[in-house]
Swiss-Prot record:
It catalyses: alpha-D-glucosamine 1-phosphate = D-glucosamine 6-phosphate. It comes from Bacillus cereus (strain ATCC 14579 / DSM 31 / CCUG 7414 / JCM 2152 / NBRC 15305 / NCIMB 9373 / NCTC 2599 / NRRL B-3711). CDD domains: GlmM (cd05802). This is Phosphoglucosamine mutase. The keyword Metal-binding applies. Catalyzes the conversion of glucosamine-6-phosphate to glucosamine-1-phosphate. Keywords: Isomerase, Magnesium, Metal-binding, Phosphoprotein. Binds 1 Mg(2+) ion per subunit. It is an enzyme of class 5 (isomerase). Mg(2+) binds at residues 100, 240, 242, 244.
Amino acid sequence: MGKYFGTDGVRGVANKELTPELAFKIGRFGGYVLTKDTDRPKVIIGRDTRVSGHMLEGALVAGLLSTGAEVMRLGVISTPGVAYLTKALDAQAGVMISASHNPVQDNGIKFFGSDGFKLTDEQEAEIEALLDKEVDELPRPTGTNLGQVSDYFEGGQKYLQYIKQTVEEDFSGLHIALDCAHGATSSLAPYLFADLEADISTMGTSPNGMNINEGVGSTHPEGLAELVKEKGADIGLAFDGDGDRLIAVDEKGNIVDGDQIMFICAKYMKETGQLKHNTVVSTVMSNLGFYKALEANNITSDKTAVGDRYVMEEMKRGGYNLGGEQSGHIILLDYITTGDGMLSALQLVNIMKMTKKPLSELAGEMTKFPQLLVNVRVTDKKLALENEKIKEIIRVVEEEMNGDGRILVRPSGTEPLIRVMAEAPTQEVCDAYVHRIVEVVKAEVGAE
């Protein structure tokens, strides 16, 4: 990660850390790096429903126009919608203004290259080098060479028509409950599922600029679980603020997370001959029950570091077409170049329809191990990982587990924390393992 770019673009509190001045520079320098080899390049911009989106969009557009780029504004649209349209509209770059599942005061800017994929580390480093220069030496076109701006608010519909054709038949006879987090999918998802002839009930579809992710969406699926039970729905689908995540709820009101959704997709894709190299890519945070369920179905798993960009890198490297995270980022690389909540939702409902099985039965084929994650504030993350007493307690606990559980001790990527996670057959055993390790970490390198 660089000075400005984190694992998912540039993020910060809007108008404090992510200022219009910085957004202008990101537009100018980012636009230049991605389009310098093209005459009159085209750049598309989408945003979620945050109140700061208009402010940052205006600054970004100005920066891009100052390099001579033609800018097309898509309005409110999901992140995967921008990724798809960047390639579909032959744009040289796409930009999404969103902080995903973060609270309303945050916002972010992420770029997509002409192929619809997020930027490489090298491209981000090139943009950062320009941002840090004291003098802006980039060309400044004038007159008719300046860029112009246009609106293409139909882009959302073009994207919906594309993902809609990935399913085999309509969803008539199904009652689907939707939670759109008052975010980018608020008008898109209800239209999509109604268009597929499902009966729908909705929540989180009244964005006012201030309420994105507030007690709703994929990070707060409890409200959707209540709606499913109240309406007698067959399935609940919860998206996050920018629509790149999906968490589901079965017909009984049980939450179905990203690991379970990946397993359901993997099993169905294998049975129908669609799972490339018989492999699913996931992160080290996926539940042990996920790996055991894959193993029982003779499906291979490939693990990466935490973060959907690392999942994507491994998928591209190995030629795999299914990957994701427990948090609900599901990547279906045959169709879209990033995690896509609505596309994942379509596939999940399609599998229910094709197998004639309720979601509870499909998800029940994977038994989740109880899991506990505790964050310990430390003085030095590096010292913690090298500490002999910490290494010893991890070794002792792993020996006691004897393969019937899992320990993961890793540093936070952004804070002075060590994350201690365990999975075991019962919650009681799981909690005991974690607290034994946490006590040693605190005694050796604890900051409090």
